[in-house]
């Protein structure tokens, strides 16, 4: 029997949502409420392929949820709010407390609040959404799905930093990793595409958007990932620096007179591709600039791809080989130029990719390797909301033994040719 699940991502002044029919994994509607708390809040919802926008006063998240539910009824997506049988909430940080998704209780709320010191900009906002939905829909399960949970299978040698050990014991300083819901979704889908059990596969997942992270997934479990204690670590990103020598922070402070917080702001918002080029963090802009001969843009693209390229080599060594490389997220799904730069030179480890196939894939699923390539290379559009909805069914105990799409797709594979 089909169930309607609401996947939610609450920000401090926004609420993104998707209403999904499960187990078919069919999108009913999606939308976003922006500028919550201001006089000109913006409510956007998709109805029958058309995007409808309304500007009104929305004072808080509870009011935003009520407006969203009323819109569902107005457009006959539901007859009553009881038609929604569960909600799933993206929560950025679960620390070591939450190695998997969990049904929200008062105790879970308190634990998420305690973890806010690890994600001060995100966890409190995520909680506002959870509390609004729990108040307005008290009879259904509300499941928290954490960006960090998927990476809790990393071994100590992957997540510990070479710092005094008591920093880990006392303050929880370690690598946590992020984008876990995306890495989990695309790795499962990759196994379906190649027609092999995920337990038998070594997968390198490249989530490349404005934020980017790489994950080594062995037998379906994350054993390492590029982001760290925060999403600032790892590869170069749109506005984030990625890894650098930590001694640069006091050096920059001394040279510029800036505080530590101000330097961190620069590393998060003024660095990466934006910092390198001085013009844009948008890869499309930089690709055009490079085509027209701008040297700094060309170097930035090469550097960006090189960092990802190195992680692939590192993670292949870590897993004693690789069976599948997956590209996902905005850049990974749409930029054949970056994919090509990343893959160039990996033939020595069995990666034989087809430039024509690579160039033809933009935002759609498929292979970009030659049929004879030992390592399969895939583009897989991510769908974190579907992954969240699956967890609502699983942890909210809503499964009435109707097979989920992931189960009846297990043997579906895509031909290489």
Swiss-Prot record:
Domain of life: Bacteria
Gene Ontology biological process: acetate metabolic process; acetyl-CoA biosynthetic process
Chaperone as UniProt keyword: no
Cross-referenced SUPFAM superfamilies: Actin-like ATPase domain
Gene3D superfamilies, A to Z: 3.30.420.40
Site (Transition state stabilizer): 179, 240
Protein localization: Cytoplasm
EC number, as in UniProt: 2.7.2.1
Cofactor(s) recorded in Swiss-Prot or TrEMBL: Mg(2+); Mn(2+)
Enzymatic class: transferase
GO molecular function: acetate kinase activity; ATP binding; magnesium ion binding
Single GO cellular component term: cytoplasm
Binding-site residues, Mg(2+): 9, 384
Catalytic activity, reaction form: acetate + ATP = acetyl phosphate + ADP
Pathway it works in: Metabolic intermediate biosynthesis; acetyl-CoA biosynthesis; acetyl-CoA from acetate: step 1/2
Family statement drawn from the similarity comment of this UniProt entry: Belongs to the acetokinase family.
Chain's role: Catalyzes the formation of acetyl phosphate from acetate and ATP. Can also catalyze the reverse reaction.
Listed name of the protein: Acetate kinase
Organism (species): Staphylococcus epidermidis (strain ATCC 35984 / DSM 28319 / BCRC 17069 / CCUG 31568 / BM 3577 / RP62A)
Source species taxonomy: Bacteria, Bacillati, Bacillota, Bacilli, Bacillales
């Amino acid at each position: 029997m089909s169930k309607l699940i609401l996947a939610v991502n609450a920000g401090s002044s926004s609420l993104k949502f998707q209403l999904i029919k499960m187990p078919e994994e069919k999108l009913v509607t999606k939308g976003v409420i922006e500028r919550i708390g201001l006089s000109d809040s913006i409510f956007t919802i998709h109805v029958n392929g058309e995007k409808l926008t309304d500007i009104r006063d929305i004072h808080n998240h509870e009011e935003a949820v009520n407006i969203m539910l009323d819109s569902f009824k107005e457009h006959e997506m539901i007859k009553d709010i009881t038609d929604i049988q569960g909600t799933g909430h993206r929560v950025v940080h679960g620390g070591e407390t939450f190695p998997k998704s969990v049904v929200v209780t008062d105790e879970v709320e308190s634990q998420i609040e305690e973890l806010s010191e690890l994600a001060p900009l995100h966890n409190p906002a995520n909680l506002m959404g959870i509390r609004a939905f729990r108040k307005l829909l008290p009879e259904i399960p509300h499941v928290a799905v954490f960006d960090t949970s998927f990476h809790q299978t990393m071994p100590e040698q992957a997540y510990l930093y070479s710092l005094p050990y008591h920093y880990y014991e006392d303050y929880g300083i370690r690598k946590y990793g992020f984008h876990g819901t995306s890495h989990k979704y695309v790795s499962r889908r990759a196994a379906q595409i190649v027609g092999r059990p995920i337990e038998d596969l070594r997968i390198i997942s490249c989530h490349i958007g404005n934020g980017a992270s790489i994950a080594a997934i062995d037998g379906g479990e994350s054993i390492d990932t590029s982001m760290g204690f925060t999403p600032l670590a790892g590869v170069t990103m749109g506005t984030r620096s990625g890894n650098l020598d930590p001694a640069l922070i006091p050096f920059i402070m001394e040279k510029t007179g800036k505080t530590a917080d101000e330097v961190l702001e620069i590393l998060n918002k003024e660095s990466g591709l934006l910092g390198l080029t001085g013009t844009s963090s948008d890869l499309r802009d930089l690709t055009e600039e490079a085509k027209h001969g701008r040297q700094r843009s060309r170097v930035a693209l090469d550097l960006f791809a090189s960092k990802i390229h190195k992680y692939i080599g590192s993670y292949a060594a870590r897993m004693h080989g690789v069976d599948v490389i997956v590209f996902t997220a905005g850049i990974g799904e749409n930029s054949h130029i970056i994919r090509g730069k990343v893959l160039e030179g990996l033939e020595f480890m069995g990666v034989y990719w087809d430039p024509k196939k690579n160039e033809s894939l933009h935002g759609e699923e498929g292979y970009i390797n030659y049929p004879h390539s030992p390592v399969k290379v895939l583009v897989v559009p991510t769908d974190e909301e579907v992954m969240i909805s699956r967890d609502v069914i699983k942890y909210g105990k809503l499964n009435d033994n109707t097979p989920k799409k992931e189960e009846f797709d297990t043997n579906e594979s895509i031909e290489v040719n």
